[in-house]
Amino acid sequence: MSPNSKGVEILSIGTELLLGNIINTNAQWISEQLSQLGLNHFRQSTVGDNCDRIVRVIQEISKRSNLLITTGGLGPTPDDLTTEAIAKSFNVTLFERPHLWDEIKQKLPNSKLHEDSSSLRKQCFFPKNAQIINNPRGTAPGMIWEPIKGFTILTFPGVPSEMKTMWEETAYDFIQTKFSDTYSFFSNTLKFAGIGESSVAEKINDLLNLKNPTVAPYANLGEVKLRITARAKNEVEAKNIIKPIKEKLKQEFSKFIFGEDNDTLPSILIKELTKRKQTIVFAESCTGGLLSASLTSISGSSQVFQGSIVSYSNELKHLLLDISEEKLAKYGAVSEEVCEAMAINVKKKLRADWAISISGIAGPNGGSQNKPVGLVYISISGPNNYITTIKKQFNSTRNRLEIQTLSVNVCLNSLRLILLSDSK
């Protein structure tokens, strides 16, 4: 986009967004796409399903931007008002595109067409000169339309899978050709575990003021990310700009960096175990299967993950994991002694190379003075009778799911570090 351009705006339409019923992932995804295209994206708006309000917002945007991208409000229901509101904003008539009705009829069963033909048909009406954006995944097409000189509107349905497909198949090339200049933004994200955001930021203070590339830290629960973004003519040039900063960070934080971009702790652990042709099992108590779910959510986990025993009660710890009643009575389920026995025994029972066990108090109830909420024991059992136990005391003000999620991250990262040290 040229230096004199007014920029791009995103307009998200839907009362459900204002009520907080759904998270606006569409705007986030489109923002990333615009950044990759090197476009100036300065503002986002959200408006409910009210035609007059949508009209007012569109008219305001048309005075300050070159390109408007809308999501939501396309479809057959009475509250799908986007196309109607756009037409009203510029005082134009909507015309039916008969071929679109033919396409809708092919996508839906006859019974549905008979019941809702009039409401479904409203999806076929567009301004006279609008270019249609086909929707391979649904019935609601979008459009590319320039209602006034220097201002273009692209419309998409609110369903993320439909919007993304339409963007990738039609809109991306159009925007790149018409609006993108010779420079684009390229980002590379480094992911950290076992270190806090403030500790990372403190060590990279000199990098935070860079202009090209820029370096920005941000945190999710249990991990820190550093996004390095370069403005360049192509990806090769961008990689060359990013490379020295990336190498400096890897030297500074070697063991804390577990991956890049789309990597996750589960995917990295699966990769490392697959490389070694080793298997893993779990014995879970306070996480209730969350550790197992983190691994099985990744394609390819079956190559390394054998299974798990979720033994929430003391009775099942005794019956399924052979933890003696005497040990449970003496030390309690949340203890180093019981957690170690869980790891050793599940590894033996399920015949794996590695085992992780976890037992703790996730809260908000169940804590005591000696064993407060947030206390978690994690044991890792491995080849050659290897055993180690990690004791964590998470902040008791965290909610139950946060403590469980942080516990899972510690499990995965701890084994990652063990494998890393073993390979040296």
From Swiss-Prot:
InterPro entries documented for this protein: CinA, CinA-like_C, CinA_C, CinA_KH, Competence-induced_CinA, MoaB/Mog-like_dom_sf, MoaB/Mog_dom
Top-level taxon of the source organism: Bacteria
Listed transmembrane segments: none
Coiled coil: none
Signal sequence extent: none
Similarity-based family: Belongs to the CinA family.
PANTHER family per UniProt: NICOTINAMIDE-NUCLEOTIDE AMIDOHYDROLASE PNCC, NMN AMIDOHYDROLASE-LIKE PROTEIN YFAY
The protein's name in its UniProt record: CinA-like protein
